[in-house]
Swiss-Prot record:
Region (Catalytic): 184-595
This enzyme's EC code(s): 1.1.1.34
GO CC terms, sorted: endoplasmic reticulum membrane; peroxisomal membrane
InterPro entries assigned to the protein according to its UniProt record, in alphabetical order: HMG_CoA_Rdtase, HMG_CoA_Rdtase_cat_sf, HMG_CoA_Rdtase_CS, HMG_CoA_Rdtase_eu_arc, HMG_CoA_Rdtase_N, HMG_CoA_Rdtase_NAD(P)-bd_sf, HMG_CoA_Rdtase_sub-bd_dom_sf
Described function: Catalyzes the synthesis of mevalonate. The specific precursor of all isoprenoid compounds present in plants.
Disulfide pairings: none
Main EC class the enzyme belongs to: oxidoreductase
Active site, renumbered: E278, K410, D486, H584
Protein name: 3-hydroxy-3-methylglutaryl-coenzyme A reductase 2
Membrane topology summary: Multi-pass membrane protein
SUPFAM superfamilies noted in UniProt: NAD-binding domain of HMG-CoA reductase, Substrate-binding domain of HMG-CoA reductase
Keywords: Endoplasmic reticulum, Glycoprotein, Isoprene biosynthesis, Membrane, NADP, Oxidoreductase, Transmembrane, Transmembrane helix
Pathway: Metabolic intermediate biosynthesis; (R)-mevalonate biosynthesis; (R)-mevalonate from acetyl-CoA: step 3/3
Amino acid sequence: MDVRRRSEKPVYPSKVFGADEKPLKPHNNQQQEDNNTLLIDASDALPLPLYLTNGLFFTMFFSVMYFLLSRWREKIRNSTPLHVVTLSELGAIVSLIASVIYLLGFFGIGFVQTFVSRGNNDSWDENDEEFLLKEDSRCGPATTLGCAIPAPPARQISPMAPPQPAMSMVEKPSPLITPASSEEDEEIINSVVQGKFPSYSLVIQLGDVSAAASLRKEVMQRITGKSLEGLPLEGFTYESILGQCCEMPIGYVQIPVGIAGPLLLNGKEFSVPMATTEGCLVASTNRGCKAIYASGGATCIVLRDGMTRAPCVRFGTAKRAAELKFFVEDPIKFETLANVFNQSSRFGRLQRIQCAIAGKNLYMRFVCSTGDAMGMNMVSKGVQNVLDYLQNEYPDMDVIGISGNFCSDKKPAAVNWIEGRGKSVVCEAIITEEVVKKVLKTEVAALVELNMLKNLTGSAMAGALGGFNAHASNIVSAVFIATGQDPAQNIESSHCITMMEAVNDGKDLHISVTMPSIEVGTVGGGTQLASQSACLNLLGVKGANREAPGSNARLLATVVAGSVLAGELSLMSAISAGQLVNSHMKYNRSTKASS
């Protein structure tokens, strides 16, 4: 092999070139050397000279460390908690962190830059190989040598193929791309897909909630590779949910709304809106409404009205926890606490405080009226005011959480079943023998026996908590979704016991539902949305009642209970008559799935 060392600099012949010939131009690296291009040091990016910057951070590190150590010794002597810091201590901590980061990440920058700026003495470097290959692929003859040499065929140098990435065990979905309406939108979409821009900031960037929802939907399609074509986007006022109902929307879900009724309740007729995807539910409830109407209507009474919130506090001993329990249960002290609580709202009024102790932990269940609002935010604000007041009276009290699950919210709990939460309601009706036979297609005795063995004995065998009914949750959920209530509160709102008894010498049927914790409101949350507001308006309970605050929410609770009464009556009759399977096969079976 002929190995020859290349000269440090290319030597160009001094011979005069032809008219059509150009001398071989020096490589760009050589041009930079000829032009005496200055090399940039890494320390040039610093605002101060390197030695001053290093000295500054050295001084800051040791001075701040000395300050913090002295403050630490003082806190130990004074028994001050270490986590309590002043503004000067906070600034010292930040300065210490900054100096440590600099010393670990940037110290010795002058030493490092010597390697960065050190060049190769040989002007021919590795990058010159590409230059040689390009210049050596000339197609014309080398006439400058004074002889005619046949031109060699030009060599075709194919670029190397980039390395293929290793196969992943999980195949990523191919992005589903829909053309954006403008180049600016396309740029924003790509930024979100690549993780350079957060999706939740689209509203701030665009200034339009609807446009942000449209772009966010397109982003989700590209990231997941799944089509969202069936999820509607147009036809919804997204400004109405901004900051209160839903974050980062990409559309809305359509749920059909049916009407059951008229429901004759306390002498008034109500057309009950029910949002559901379960076939036969509206039809069954409608049949129950018909039976109640034909029998003279139903009567409904609100027994209690009070939303609850139960914070958890802890003391050093159980004795101290008991002292606070006696304090808040004292009628004289309660008046003071009620005044503190009531300052948080025009409608929130503290009714009572129920306490429970677990060791040195105290749970205080605040009960208050909340007007026409469901009231969770209202009662939480009032409880916070009381806790701030008690903190001054009991400085050793440690607030664990404003909610200690003794409330109890969105969970089946015996405290709600026994003490009630929200609106406690009982609804009753007497269904005549004729209606039982002609409308419900069953017998009074059969209904009474079925209710005892199914709703009472059967639920007891199952260990049910508040579930002594046939399907109260079905009706509660449907009315809740239609009227903008919190669907998650269907859990405790569906607590119900259904009672049936033969009256009037066994000819007629007395049926009742007792529901101790219906949590509803006619203002706030989803009640202000257009569709839900229309359903509330249909019932005559839209918004707040200015003349009698809270009456609209209580009326809505009675409508819920009356609808449950109708649903229980119809379903129990269908089971008693053996019609349940046939009716569900007719109304609750998808023809597409069965075909």
